[in-house]
Amino acid sequence: MRVAVLSGAGISAESGVPTFRDDKNGLWARFDPYELSSTQGWLRNPERVWGWYLWRHYLVANVEPNDGHRAIAAWQDHAEVSVITQNVDDLHERAGSGAVHHLHGSLFEFRCARCGVPYTDALPEMPEPAIEVEPPVCDCGGLIRPDIVWFGEPLPEEPWRSAVEATGSADVMVVVGTSAIVYPAAGLPDLALARGTAVIEVNPEPTPLSGSATISIRESASQALPGLLERLPALLK
């Protein structure tokens, strides 16, 4: 059996991955998210953007995968599993998932904003947020930026192509922790449904996908995903 998993922020929130508004110090709450997650914001103030992502990099590195991540990884023992994620953390990989396609980039990959060369040097620890931090400089003179898809930027071609292929060949698609409003990723379940593929939504709250999904499970990822593969035949009767 081939299983395609589309995951969003909900699954990582259970591990304590912070959102923009989760800064307990309130240091970042006064900034528009667009200013920290766009090419325009980067060009205006690369030190501020780098400080924001350096802090998030540190925070995400210090949380652990949850039962939802581990359940998806365990499915590999019984099925061919492809993970398509809108998340920029590495929790699927750390849980043991093999094929993970990051549609929005990764907090753990960096590149030169000018020449595109990957940056692999170690980053400084940042247990406390700082408003502005000087980004590293590439040999070409360009600044190093996170390899994240910012507002207005296209999705990376290879992960998107792999996501479409995995969706097109899946026997079942599990959509977990996503709001189903961020396109083009939100269109993948529709692609699966158009092929006659069963789409199982796992989300504590209703989403725009809920009405068309084959099954909607109103539970969190860590509640619903362990044992879900074994329950599929009964659920899909």
From Swiss-Prot:
The active site is at H104 (proton acceptor). It comes from the Bacteria. Residues 1-235 form the Deacetylase sirtuin-type domain. GO terms for cellular component: cytoplasm; peptidoglycan-based cell wall. InterPro entries: DHS-like_NAD/FAD-binding_dom (IPR029035), NAD-dep_sirtuin_deacylases (IPR050134), Sirtuin (IPR003000), Sirtuin_cat_small_dom_sf (IPR026591), Sirtuin_class_III (IPR027546), Ssirtuin_cat_dom (IPR026590). 2 residues (Tyr-53 and Arg-56) present in a large hydrophobic pocket are probably involved in substrate specificity. They are important for desuccinylation activity, but dispensable for deacetylation activity. This is NAD-dependent protein deacylase. It comes from Mycobacterium tuberculosis (strain ATCC 25618 / H37Rv).
